[in-house]
Amino acid sequence: MFDTNSTRLPIWGIGCNPWTAEHVDQTLVSGNDIC
């Protein structure tokens, strides 16, 4: 669940909706913005 992208989670969490780590990971892979 928490891999190399785990470092991005705190950054994405700021000013964005509180998504789960798995959802954020899938979003980053998809290349879509969650904000």
From Swiss-Prot:
Q: Which residues carry this modification: (3R,4S)-4-hydroxyisoleucine?
A: I11
Q: Provide the positions where the record notes the PTM (3R,4R)-4,5-dihydroxyisoleucine.
A: I11
Record-listed cross-link 2'-cysteinyl-6'-hydroxytryptophan sulfoxide (Trp-Cys), residues: W12-C16
Q: Which UniProt keywords apply?
A: Hydroxylation, Thioether bond, Toxin
Q: Which residues form the propeptide?
A: 1-10, 19-35
Q: Provide the cross-link position: Cyclopeptide (Ile-Pro).
A: I11-P18
Q: Which domain of life is it from?
A: Eukaryota
InterPro entries recorded for this chain?
A: Amanitin/phalloidin
The yes or no answer to whether the keyword Iron is present is no
**Could you state what the record's PTM comment says about this protein?**
Processed by the macrocyclase-peptidase enzyme POPB to yield a toxic bicyclic octapeptide. POPB first removes 10 residues from the N-terminus. Conformational trapping of the remaining peptide forces the enzyme to release this intermediate rather than proceed to macrocyclization. The enzyme rebinds the remaining peptide in a different conformation and catalyzes macrocyclization of the N-terminal 8 residues.
Q: Give this protein's Gene Ontology molecular function annotations.
A: toxin activity
Note, other: The typical symptoms of amatoxin poisoning are gastro-intestinal distress beginning 6-12 hours after ingestion, a remission phase lasting 12-24 hours, and progressive loss of liver function culminating in death within 3-5 days. One of the few effective treatments is liver transplantation.
What is the similarity comment for this entry? Belongs to the MSDIN fungal toxin family.
Protein's name according to its UniProt entry: Alpha-amanitin proprotein 2
- State which gene encodes it: AMA1-2
